[in-house]
């Protein structure tokens, strides 16, 4: 929004040209989201407490989690508000990338909100029926996938980038829709499964978003894109604003979500943030890289799939409890140790993912 105002004011003073630089607006976007989260966080927590919107804790979970019962949840509303305000202020509203991301965050945030509302307000421990949640996620993801395929302006927007191989970038055609669908829905649910400990999901989300900010910036510049053998995607620089807004909002939320948490993000936060990461990966053609950098999310998801599959096929469980972070809790690891070690793994995987841009 302010880009247009700055463009007009440039007629009177050339100093306003600085707002045309993506990097400058990205920094302002990060700071805006961060300050907004830190400023309104306490107010939201107080409001959630007054409304008695508290976390529902499973009776069959680790005993250490029983103390979390009643902790304010749906804090993802704070994250979404910070991102929306930041992007609307500093993003180029003429960019389709911006509106795609706002739609993703809004639609998946709404699905998560309905799920949280049923759990904590209507006291329905199951929340939104899994079948309906999946149907709604699928509808939103397919809308995005079809839109991106139909509006692709150059061949690079539907190619698949394969890490470690600089000359392997197959044209996907209509398969793009299928890959985009599974990436968005898969990432959304993966982050949701990871969000089981204080700060466990938000920090890897911040790290992956920061990495994608760099990738989006490089993809938007022909010289960098050609040098790194990645698709040149004109206009993708606007995704940098979205990514840094996620980073700022996430760090601000972590201030209150770090152990012991004062607030949880709920499904309204985890489903929307996961879908956002998946969509960014699709937009910059780095779906495989998301699997690497978001390895913690993949690990959590696979642990659930293996646990359920093993129990149904063999009648035996592989882990003491799934997702896998609960397994380590039941082994006796203190919650902060599990969290920080998963963060360390995430740092390593994000750096590995960034290294693949050059290791080709």
Curated annotation (Swiss-Prot):
Gene Ontology BP term (one): cell wall organization
Broad enzyme group: transferase
Major place of residence: membrane
Catalytic activity entry: UDP-N-acetyl-alpha-D-muramoyl-L-alanyl-gamma-D-glutamyl-meso-2,6-diaminopimeloyl-D-alanyl-D-alanine + di-trans,octa-cis-undecaprenyl phosphate = di-trans,octa-cis-undecaprenyl diphospho-N-acetyl-alpha-D-muramoyl-L-alanyl-D-glutamyl-meso-2,6-diaminopimeloyl-D-alanyl-D-alanine + UMP
GO molecular function: metal ion binding; phospho-N-acetylmuramoyl-pentapeptide-transferase activity; UDP-N-acetylmuramoyl-L-alanyl-D-glutamyl-meso-2,6-diaminopimelyl-D-alanyl-D-alanine:undecaprenyl-phosphate transferase activity
Membrane topology of the entry: Multi-pass membrane protein
Gene Ontology cellular component annotations, sorted alphabetically: plasma membrane
Identification of the protein by name: Phospho-N-acetylmuramoyl-pentapeptide-transferase
Subcellular location: Cell inner membrane
Bilayer-spanning residue ranges: 26-46, 74-94, 97-117, 134-154, 168-188, 199-219, 236-256, 263-283, 288-308, 338-358
Domain of life: Bacteria
Native source species: Shewanella baltica (strain OS185)
HAMAP family for this protein: MraY
Cofactor(s) required, per the database record: Mg(2+)
Family as reported in the entry's similarity comment: Belongs to the glycosyltransferase 4 family. MraY subfamily.
Alphabetical keyword list: Cell cycle, Cell division, Cell inner membrane, Cell membrane, Cell shape, Cell wall biogenesis/degradation, Magnesium, Membrane, Metal-binding, Peptidoglycan synthesis, Transferase, Transmembrane, Transmembrane helix
Enzyme Commission numbers on file: 2.7.8.13
Pathway, per record: Cell wall biogenesis; peptidoglycan biosynthesis
Keyword field contains Cell cycle: yes
InterPro entries reported in the protein's UniProt record: Glycosyl_transferase_4 (IPR000715), PNAcMuramoyl-5peptid_Trfase (IPR003524), PNAcMuramoyl-5peptid_Trfase_CS (IPR018480)
